[in-house]
Amino acid sequence: MSDAKQNTPTKALVVFSGGQDSTTCLIQALSQYDEVHGITFDYGQRHRQEIEVAKSLATELKLASHKVMDTTLLNELAISALTRDAIPVSHELMNNGLPNTFVPGRNILFLTLAGIYAYQLGCDAIITGVCETDFSGYPDCRNEFVQSMQNSLALGMDKPLKIITPLMWLNKAETWALADKYQQLALVQHQTLTCYNGIVGKGCGDCPACVLRQRGLDDYLQNSQSVMDSLNSKL
């Protein structure tokens, strides 16, 4: 969708964690839709400070509404470094080839609940910041999975609800460029929470999420024009 809003009023629901990716998607959505809502999930996550960050950003960015939904049942079912404070976040993959920060079923649940809520709100689209290019080995960040969920929601609710993934084919440097394109680089850099240890902005600098975030930012700042050109070629 182009940045020019359409003549027919449009609504979107953003799956919004308060992190870099979802905040960037939210910023873009505000320029593309007449009405933007946010939904944040509280699943007892290790970095649960992100919920307060999401609330603050939702107010600052003037969302039409922002819902925080209790999904702590997921914490009981899914054992992960993100749902158990006693499990240290590891840089090594588990025996199944996945990082120990993978939360089984998380995006299945989140997109299902977002679909139900979007139906209630009358939204045209759900927007989520999952990414296959820079994804951390999570199977529920793949485009194939997202398309499958979109088809299931449309069939199950008899409504052509789209799941839009603006970052799916962007690398992390291009995601930073997208925030800069909307003049919100500083906000995303200093006010979002990506860190698995719950530290706002630059984060702990050590967990996998922080390493990926900082590497992308360094790449963008050192090669801003070429990265922006690459981003624009994908939009």
Swiss-Prot record:
Specify whether Glycoprotein is a keyword of the entry. Answer: no
**Co-factor binding comment:** Binds 1 zinc ion per subunit.
What does the entry list as the binding residues for Zn(2+)? C195, C204, C207, C210
Please name the pathway: Purine metabolism; 7-cyano-7-deazaguanine biosynthesis
Q: Which Pfam families match?
A: QueC
Any keyword Nucleotide-binding? yes
Biological process (GO), any one: queuosine biosynthetic process
GO molecular function terms listed in the Swiss-Prot or TrEMBL record: ATP binding; ligase activity, forming carbon-nitrogen bonds; zinc ion binding
Protein name, please? Answer: 7-cyano-7-deazaguanine synthase
Q: Which organism is it from?
A: Shewanella frigidimarina (strain NCIMB 400)
